[in-house]
Amino acid sequence: MSQLPRRDPRQEWIARNRLHPRHEEVLAALGQGATSEWPGPNGLMRKNPHRVGFIGPNGIKRIDRSGTQQGAGGGKASASVAGHKPLTEIAEPAFLVAVVPDMTGGRLSGHDKDLLGLARRLADADPAAQGAVLAVVFGSHKETNLGEAGVDRLLHLDSPEIAGYAPEARVGALITVEQAWTPRHWLLPDSKLGGGELGRRLAARLGERPATGIWQVEADAESATGWQCTARGAAGSLDIRRPLPRIALALAECAEPVSETRHTAAELVLPQPLPSTLSRIQDLGQVSVDPASVALSEAEFILAAGNGVRDWDAYHRAASVLGATEGASRVAVDEGYMPRDRQVGATGTWVTARVYIAVGISGAIQHLQGIQPCEKVIAINMDPSCDMIKRADLAVIGDSTQILEALVTLVSQAREEKRDAA
């Protein structure tokens, strides 16, 4: 009998159709479980209302709108599982899958974590020939949980030659990695933050034909590489399928981030020094940009105001001093205090900021949905029981005007001290 895996098209169709009466049954049979949320075709997160919440002690279902309770198991169970992830150590890998994350701001972005999840799939596909994920990180970084993101080996390159915008020097460093370990796959984010350009330069140097705009990778026994990838083409209007090449540039949400295992992230050292390259590019530093001109969907630091703000001049002054992009709740927009394009939430703009400060925002459900992807949320509010306080990673209870004035004073003093020291 053939050992090739057999696929049931009907079961796959039911698994994709969340309204089918046998949807959860088929998911359980396929080992996927029932999903509580998933990204929709336009990028918005969809939630299954039957999988949100938890059963209270009196048997009544409770729904926590702050986002701390997810799925049917509740937040405590999730936290317990996260604290006891099994540690996976691969002493002698059969091959390497190299990942070059963007590391914007010195930390892994959501795009980087998706890419590491894809690398983990490629490395763990064959238990008999286990691979390892090698992360090549340029410059200083602040990450302390690279192992939880799925990294088995870490190569940290931090030298003046590759600091800043230095694509030629960085490609030379990647060529050295290629000569030292010859990874089976090279994965880079297809982004405007450096990964897209670096991946194309690397492919040209190695003479490889890369795949760009990848959003899906599936196992394929008939493919020469064992994998089939689907990429965006024709300005995003066409899907192109081809065998997965050695160099792949993937989009965000190309795979699920690693969440169930921990890895060692053992540090490696290049066997030879980095080659000296004559760069034809001179990095003159970053160009200062007015935060007010940055679109909310692209902003990394947002200071949002709601109905609790009484002194709008103080709010605008704080946003200017902090260098934050201004946002607003629906109430503030409806009252005419902020323009419509500054509205945050499911009825406005979905934001993915690294830091989101909510000033005087109680936290309507549509607003909480819009800030769900934000990494750190800080709430300034007079009501300690509002939903935004429950959602926030850091909460400050008090008058927003006084708190913003004190914050502006501290930032101004710190800048003056730094200027005097220089």
From Swiss-Prot:
Keywords associated with the record: Electron transport, FAD, Flavoprotein, Transport
Details of cofactor binding: Binds 1 FAD per dimer.
KO phenotype (gene knockout): Deletion mutant loses its ability to grow using DMG as the sole nitrogen source but is still capable of utilizing sarcosine and glycine as the sole nitrogen source.
Cofactor(s) needed for function: FAD
GO biological process: fatty acid beta-oxidation using acyl-CoA dehydrogenase
Gene3D superfamilies: HUPs, TPP-binding domain
Keyword Endoplasmic reticulum: no
GO molecular function term, any single one: flavin adenine dinucleotide binding
Keyword Plastid set for record: no
Span of the signal peptide: none
Residues annotated to bind FAD: 329-330, 343-347, 360-367, 381
Span list, region Disordered: 61-80
Pfam families per UniProt: ETF, ETF_alpha
Subunit structure, interactors included: Heterodimer of an alpha and a beta subunit.
Function: Participates in the electron transfer process during N,N-dimethylglycine (DMG) degradation to sarcosine.
Record-stated family: Belongs to the ETF alpha-subunit/FixB family.
Name by which UniProt lists this protein: Electron transfer flavoprotein subunit alpha
Organism: Chromohalobacter salexigens (strain ATCC BAA-138 / DSM 3043 / CIP 106854 / NCIMB 13768 / 1H11)
